[in-house]
């Protein structure tokens, strides 16, 4: 057994964190755009189907996201001038290049999300994992023109060496830890790496598939989360970061998408809100709160 050694315990009241132009809260929206294998089980609306090969029912349900759902989400984010930070399986670049092109036209950010959602980073030695991380970085850079700065592990899974390898490969932030409302530095062997606030609560997979919430309840959860963070962020030095994690095969469905539209309308009609991308938050932190490289 071991204790974690990646970060220090720093209580919120002991920190100082501000945002550009005195914003109370930074809001970033993360569409997860993923590629699945037809012969491997994954996220399912009908779990018994995962025993079938091919699992046409669940594969088709997920495939709705890249065929229809993502385009509906793009329209909604466009309407509110909200940039997306896409958590991107690298294989999307080969299978659905039109999504990459549309995101680039909008100025969206693309962060690494592994090569495919069929391969979480578990039970890998360092060389194997480095190869996967590097392949993800290189494929996304080739498709978008920029190396990805952020990382979200498939299924938010890591090995004990993942943060070290991410820093080695030039990544600036990682979203797997989900344990804070503010960014903070991680200890890595060389360089620097931030833990960026992500959410497994304001996230449509657990909300709909685990908790069984309706779309209107998800909207209310987004609004409630925002309201509390917005009020807390009014205190000088106590600004917050709010993540909204989306999957196009869930929130991209018509009966759910209108509630996302309403939630984003509510957020963007507030003053002192910075609606931005993960890379912009990471850049602001690095410039405003420089840390010594980890040893």
Identify the residue ranges that each predicted region occupies.
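Short, glycine/charged-rich beta-strand-loop motifs at protein surfaces that mediate ligand recognition
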Residues: 209-212, 249-253
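Catalytic alpha-helical scaffold of carbohydrate-active enzymes acting on polysaccharides/glycoconjugates
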Residues: 2-194, 219-244, 250-295
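A conserved mid-domain beta-alpha-beta active-site/ligand-binding segment of alpha/beta enzyme cores
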Residues: 197-231
